[in-house]
Amino acid sequence: MSRNLPNPSLVGILFVVSTHSGPQLLYKYPHNLTDRVFSLVPRKHAGTEDGMQHLVRDDKDDDDDDELYEYNEDEDPESGDLLFFDKDGTSRDRSGINVISDTNHSQYYYGTKLELKRTLDEGRALRRATPHKYNHNRLSTEHPKRNEHSQGSKSRRSIRNTDTTQDDNYQKQKGQQEGREKKDKDKEKEKEKDAEEKGDVSEPHSAVDTFSIADDIFGMAPGYLCEILSPPRQMCNTRYEVTIQDKIFLGLPIHQHADGTWTNARSSKRSQSGRSNSLHFENLTSSTEAQLASTTAQSLTMFHLVFIMNPPATECSYRIDEMFQHVASRTSLGLRLAQQKHNYVGNQMKAIQRAREQECKEVDLDKTLSLCKLIKECYLAISTSRIANLEIDGKQVVCQIPTKYEFDSLPEPSVPYIPRSFLSSSIHSFGMWDRSNIEQQKLDDDFLQESIMCFALLLLAEPHNILQDMNIVTNSPFGKFIMLLHPSESLLKFCSKNSQHFEPSEVKSYALHLIYWKKARAIQPLSSRSVYVASPMASLTTKLFEDIYRFKARFPMSPSLPQFLKLLSPQLKKPQQFASIIPSRDHRASYFEALAWLIRFGYVNQQLTFVWLKIPKNLRVKVEEDMENEDALLKRNKDRVFGEKSQTTDNTSKTMAVQESPHNNDITTTRDTKISNNRNNGSDFDTDADANVNVNSDANTSTNAAVANTAAGLVDARKDSLINATTETTESQTERLKKQLTLSVVDDEDTIILEPGRASTLERRWINEIISVCKLSHDLIAIFYKLLKFMNGKTPLEFLIIKNEISRLDLKKLLYAIGNYIVSVRHW
């Protein structure tokens, strides 16, 4: 079994409730879960666990178990099971199922003691009805010598005469019994025909009157099963799953909270109204508690809607998850809300118990009680992979297990799928299947809400049939919306044409409703400029011959179905626009209707265009050279700036050093003092003064030279450190970019940008180089940046034309201008 095919694996539905008296089974559907034959655990392997011992044997009345070892001629010598024989001699078991054709039943019997007693009673009654057979068998099985010594020839004659008389009586009784059975079968056939005419074929009519809520469920007592399916409060209000006898019992048990409510209390931001209200509430508390105490004896504390499943082993987890997510949780939460508001489940529980007290039949409960009807409709719809439209306390709850009929890639030839499925890689978010990734589901939902107005709706059935199936009045807004839909118009255009009658939000709601109910699917608006091809998933081996006659009857003036497909997908030519196969303008409407019919039944898909940005090797080399030239120019500019700053710093430091030296100040002061003293004292001191001046001037010169040399050394060291740091930073950036360029050049001849909307720095340089090389105009540059993030091979250009309101002519000009730098692919 493939996940592409619907397989609910739903066996039955149980509704378990728990009161202060204990858990009990309130309702089950189907009613004949006991008589259904499934591959249960063999009896010889059963009872190995302590919790399953009572399913095979009962500790009470162990003496009656000796009857199991009584030998009967009707027992199978290998298995020991009691067999019956039809008129043709074929064996059957006690429920009328052929043992040879149903080996599971004979080899996998897993019954209770009550069923064994019933089997023995039926066998005993059969032996009493035909005593001659068993007497004859007993006599024939005795020892021949003992018969010869104990009986003579006369006794043998009497036995033969007695056997002959008994055979005659048996033949008469057999004829009468066959006549009665024939009459009963005729009556049953008449009842079945009446039931089929009424549309109720869910229950076999041979045992309608014998169904009881106390019947065993797959060999288990209802009381024992209810104990398992009634978990404590700590395990309620969450997913509950238990496996018993290869059957999975799945549900969401709802338990009453300690404060008596069923739903979680919502946080309220209202301010308290004052002490008076609180005092009034305190006064009412005692009386309310007294009323609750008086009614809790028979009140409902827990209810559990249980879905019994038997999925394949390879799909067990997948089928259980989808059943819980789409059906079990939605239905249980709807019941919880109804119970919280109007005590819906509690009232239905009392009504069902009252009906059973009045000896109402189990098959008649769903005709008068809404809860029983809800469970029945849910089972009949979900088990047949249909949508369940349930009514819970006057409110509609819609449940369905999503069916995968939309594929974004072609399945393997060995993988089965639903006939008339279609391929579409652009609108996969409109499908409702297997979105286990929550984040992806949120993104898909956002995309759906934003983009659905850009698509058109293709109805999957005739409009009047949809109105009839969904019980919609033709004159209602929804009915008018369905009648006015056309697959060649997007919902945006539909809103603009019918703005007086429909709001955009209303149109979006109607569209989502039709998609959910599988009455329509979202497609690209049909256009004569688009290209359509035959679908590789077309059901050419199953439905082709039927559809050929249907297509010819529907469109008598159009080519036949095979010829139409041949025109769309010629064998030796590339597919052309749809306008090329329309003979004239008068045939336009009929050809569009035929195209819509072919798309609806999965014969045709639209061919879409996807684009990637391609960066050739020469453009990457050019960008690399430009980056190297920019780095070299930046380095020269930095060296020039640092050189000018170093020269200015050297001259200033020398002057400042000479002026601010403390030794220089001391020497100058001493020299001036001595000169003035010599002038005052006379000529005797002239020789000394000249000597002092010469000595002081030499010292001043040597001091200035030392200071200048020290300052120049400090400036040179600072300049070298700055230049080295800047050079290292520039070299690290250059090396990093060179590594990226080397990888891109070496890896491939051409590079494709996968996500242009999140391009790196280097990829942006490539994109800017494309714009400069192609010499795009300002208008084309604006269109280019508008479409840039969609050039990822995931979004078709046909969709961008509608969403971004770009004309086909402008798009054609842009693609022609950048044709050397794009890779285009055409597929579904």
UniProtKB/Swiss-Prot annotation:
Disulfide bonding pattern of the chain: none
Keywords recorded for this protein, A-Z: Meiosis, Signal
Function: Mediates inactivation of the TORC1 complex in response to amino acid starvation. Required for meiotic nuclear division.
Spans annotated as Disordered: 49-87, 127-207, 644-688
Lineage: Eukaryota, Fungi, Dikarya, Ascomycota, Saccharomycotina
Pfam families: HTH_NPRL3 (PF24064), NPR3 (PF03666)
Species of provenance: Lodderomyces elongisporus (strain ATCC 11503 / CBS 2605 / JCM 1781 / NBRC 1676 / NRRL YB-4239)
Comp. bias regions, Basic residues: 127-136
Matching InterPro entries: HTH_NPRL3, Npr3
Name of the protein: Nitrogen permease regulator 3
GO biological process entries: cellular response to amino acid starvation; meiotic cell cycle; negative regulation of TORC1 signaling; positive regulation of autophagy; TORC1 signaling
